[in-house]
Regions:
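Short Gly/Thr/Asp-enriched flexible loops that form oxyanion-binding sites at enzyme active sites
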Residues: 29-33, 114-127, 187
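Glycine-rich oxoanion-binding loops at beta->alpha junctions
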Residues: 55-107, 147-154, 158
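C-terminal non-catalytic interaction/assembly regions of soluble proteins
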Residues: 237, 245-340
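N-terminal phosphate-binding or glycine-rich loops at protein starts, especially the Walker A/P-loop
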Residues: 9-55
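Single conserved hydrophobic/aromatic residue that forms the stacking wall/gate
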Residues: 338-349
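Accessory alpha-helical/coil subdomains and C-terminal extensions
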Residues: 109-111, 121, 149-252, 256
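Short, acidic/small-residue loops that bind anionic groups at enzyme active sites
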Residues: 123-146, 200-204, 257
Length: 349
């Protein structure tokens, strides 16, 4: 009797979708889900354009050939979108009904916290779901790694190196704005990797513009030919900041906003391998009868967490990481450890 029940509940068809912002390595994860599923005798369906495509029934059969020569490509072959309708109870119920209509027993959702919230709703409606952390921001608390972060931070690092070259040639001050609306990990890592003089992140927002101006002036007095400031998107207003700094110091100051280039490009080895491992584990979890789980990476191991727990966790830059970043800057004796207005106040000229 128990064997009959297990046979009835056995996963036969799985789906995979990418949701929210794209991230390098998503294709590696998709490839792993498809091939791991097929190797276990499952049917695999790709859902185009995230939850939006699910509600529009843009669902295709996936073969091993469909994911050939994709591991090295940036973006997502399944496309992605944000879907306001899926935030409603009606949209969520319809999504679950469409999964059943197409025989999808389990669903792998690749995205960030918002995507996981959608997966959680589907799980509550009886659809087995597993989430994979796909975001360049590294802002998911249950994991030390997110798909796309490694590529994005390397893209930003290489771009900042190039800005430094021209900044030195012209003896400029340069503000480079990197992605990270609510999380400053790209800014923090680039601050250390690029040897920036100053780093501004939303988690450790202790910005004092006069102190920053003083740092630039003191740096110039000491013979420094450039001054690199890395500014997270969550603080923003780099153009306005550059104008004020130039007016106050007399030093030519330029703002460079890296923008969406950080989302693109061929994924690094780490993003390809880690995304592949996560994709394979997601399929294994579905086969094992698990649902409402998020795959993560902690302490050298690929692990899984309950989605509810994962969404409840809080993540932030540690005081130690921030202190190291500050102490290694060329202005370590003038660290920006002061309080000032909120990030939005920087928009004033």
């Amino acid at each position: 009797m128990e064997e009959e029940k297990m046979a009835e509940n056995k996963i036969k068809t799985i789906g995979v979708l990418t949701s929210g912002g794209d991230a390098p390595g998503m294709n590696a994860a998709i490839r792993a889900v498809v091939r791991r599923g097929l190797s276990n005798g499952l049917n695999v369906k790709g859902i185009l354009k995230g939850y939006n495509g699910l509600l529009n029934e843009e669902i295709i059969d996936m073969s091993a050939k469909d994911v050939s020569d994709t591991i090295e490509r940036g973006g997502t072959i399944l496309y992605t979108a944000r879907c306001a309708e899926f935030r409603t109870e009606e949209g969520q119920k319809r999504g679950a009904e469409i999964c059943r209509k197409h025989g999808i027993d389990g669903l792998v959702v690749i995205g960030g916290d918002g995507s996981f919230a959608g997966a959680q709703k589907l799980a509550n409606l009886g659809i087995n779901t597993i989430g994979l952390p796909g975001t360049i921001d590294l802002d998911i608390a249950c994991t030390e790694y997110t798909i796309g972060f490694d590529t994005a931070v390397n893209t930003a690092m290489e771009a900042i190196d190039k800005v430094r070259d021209t900044s030195t040639s012209h003896e400029r001050c340069s503000i480079i704005e990197v992605m990270g609306r609510g999380a400053g990990y790209i800014a923090l890592w680039c601050g250390i990797a690029n040897g920036a003089e100053d780093v501004l992140v939303p988690e450790k927002y202790d910005y004092d513009e006069q102190k920053l101006i003083n740092n630039i002036i003191e740096s110039r007095k000491k013979g420094k030919k450039h001054h690199i400031i890395i500014n997270a998107e969550g603080i923003g207003h780099s153009e306005a900041m550059a104008k004020r700094i130039e007016a106050a110091t007399g030093i030519e100051t330029r703002a460079t906003i890296l923008g969406h280039m950080q989302r693109g490009g061929s994924p690094t080895c780490k993003d390809r391998v880690y995304a592949s491992m996560m994709g394979a584990l997601a399929v294994d979890l579905l086969i094992a009868g698990k649902t409402c789980r998020v795959v993560g990476y902690r302490h050298g191991e690929f692990v899984d967490f309950d989605i509810n727990e994962a969404l409840a966790m809080q993540k932030g830059i540690s005081d130690y990481q921030w202190e190291v970043c500050q102490s290694l800057s060329h202005n370590y004796d003038n660290c920006l450890l002061y309080t000032s207005p909120s990030p939005r106040d920087l928009s004033t000229s």
